[in-house]
Amino acid sequence: MASDPIFTLAPPLHCHYGALPPNASGWEQPPNSSGVSVAGAALAASAASRVVTSTDPSCSGFAPPDFNHCLKDWDYNGLPVLTTNAIGQWDLVCDLGWQVILEQILFILGFASGYLFLGYPADRFGRRGIVLLTLGLVGPCGVGGAAAGSSTGIMTLRFLLGFLLAGVDLGVYLMRLELCDPTQRLRVALAGELVGVGGHFLFLGLALVSKDWRFLQRMITAPCILFLFYGWPGLFLESARWLIVKRQIEEAQSVLRILAERNRPHGQMLGEEAQEALQELENTCPLPTTSTFSFASLLNYRNIWKNLLILGFTNFIAHAIRHCYQPVGGGGSPSDFYLCSLLASGTAALACVFLGVTVDRFGRRGILLLSMTLTGIASLVLLGLWDYLNDAAITTFSVLGLFSSQASAILSTLLAAEVIPTTVRGRGLGLIMALGALGGLSCPAQRLHMGHGAFLQHVVLAACALLCILSIMLLPETKRKLLPEVLRDGELCRRPSLLRQPPPNRCDHVPLLATPNPAL
């Protein structure tokens, strides 16, 4: 999603007057206005006598009253990173500014739809197939979007691009998580997030170099076609955990054998213990022969639905409230754009470092509770004390809110992937990620209303953040625990009871250190 703010950034603009028409301005009078008052004509003349700029797509405060259209071309005073974008290509300003907001909404809806609808194929046909299919289609879709000749074509192809990129993100996340043992899951998940943050910085650098939005679109999407070489046998392996759950034992043995041979020291043969473990794999996995479930049967697992509801709501709020923490004084200048871009990426990287240091020590649930608490505190301070704080204090709490909301979003996604069983992990995690993408709609929705109601929206989101704090305490702890494989395992992942000791087979009752057996 890092490309959308650059592709839809409204540049500073003014009307190119040229030879002024008889009404002494570069603005066209609406056909319904047969006569303009003397005051209106004087205001139009004064507007023509100076260079007026605006970054508001509705041209509010820019156009003279009762004048809607510029007779000449628009002059765009340049973007921070590109010479022009789709807004300047088709003059999507003033009365056409709604198309820019519609493109932003469709792009986010593309991500939400991809997360939601590609989770089932990932569970049914495998993670590898979904990743290869969507990666292969990203390139043609992106190149086609760069060659589009109208804003309608751009919006359609951007929706499809978001749909496909969501499939790539979901499939790769599942494969990373299912490949690791319990002690490495957090590190691998955070490494993937840091790679994404690095991609944001790389995209900003490519935008500075390319200058043309069409060339930039081709540059970032066309190389995805090369990822089709991942389909070469033995190069990009299917998730062995998913193969075992689907009872494809021979394929799982083949994948595990390849991984074991790659990880063994150079020049050594595969050990006998590894060979015996691979041969006995079928006997040690007493799973049902089928892993297809009806929707009615899924409704019986109330604990799984409770975890999905809490984590989905938390992820939604963490993404929705993020735009409320923009630094004070963002006026649309190049320096403000760079500040917002670097601040968003920098706080995401800082959140990854914070989670890597604290989560394995204090647990997923505790750090998620702390992150949402900091998010709520930052919102309450900004809402209640905005008029009494200086710019430095406002910026400090805005950065705190950005940091904590980033950490909450990352950790809620990881925790959801760890409590959802393998049989439905694609669908469950896709639902969580789709809710997070829908939370991103709060920013274009606010722009659609010209910023009206921003305070009320922040109040509602802050109240929901406080509600998340209460609900997070109902979640189980998944630190150093095995991933649940079937629905029965996911149903046993519960929060430890506060009043009585849970039985030993509960998912939450796993000792941190193994106790010696006195009988031995």
Swiss-Prot record:
**Gene3D superfamilies from the entry?**
MFS general substrate transporter like domains (1.20.1250.20)
Show the stretches that span the lipid bilayer.
100-120, 129-149, 154-174, 189-209, 219-239, 303-322, 337-357, 366-386, 397-417, 428-448, 455-475
Cellular location of this protein?
Answer: Cell membrane; Vacuole membrane
Q: Which GO terms describe its biological process?
A: siderophore transport
Domain of life, per the record? Eukaryota
Q: Name one GO cellular component term.
A: vacuolar membrane
Q: How does it sit in the membrane?
A: Multi-pass membrane protein
Listed GO MF terms:
transmembrane signaling receptor activity; transmembrane transporter activity
For the keyword Glycoprotein, the answer is: yes
Sugar attachment sites are N23, N32
* Tissues with expression: Expressed in brain.
The record ties this protein, via InterPro entries, to: MFS_dom, MFS_sugar_transport-like, MFS_trans_sf, Sugar_transporter_CS
Main subcellular location of this protein, as a coarse class = membrane
Which UniProt key words apply to this protein? Answer: Cell membrane, Glycoprotein, Ion transport, Iron, Iron transport, Membrane, Receptor, Transmembrane, Transmembrane helix, Transport, Vacuole
What family does this belong to?
A: Belongs to the major facilitator (TC 2.A.1) superfamily. Organic cation transporter (TC 2.A.1.19) family.
Q: Give a short account of what the protein does.
A: Cell surface receptor for LCN2 (24p3) that plays a key role in iron homeostasis and transport. Able to bind iron-bound LCN2 (holo-24p3), followed by internalization of holo-24p3 and release of iron, thereby increasing intracellular iron concentration and leading to inhibition of apoptosis. Also binds iron-free LCN2 (apo-24p3), followed by internalization of apo-24p3 and its association with an intracellular siderophore, leading to iron chelation and iron transfer to the extracellular medium, thereby reducing intracellular iron concentration and resulting in apoptosis.
> By what name is this protein known?
Solute carrier family 22 member 17
Taxonomic lineage per UniProt? Answer: Eukaryota, Metazoa, Chordata, Craniata, Vertebrata
Gene for this protein? Slc22a17
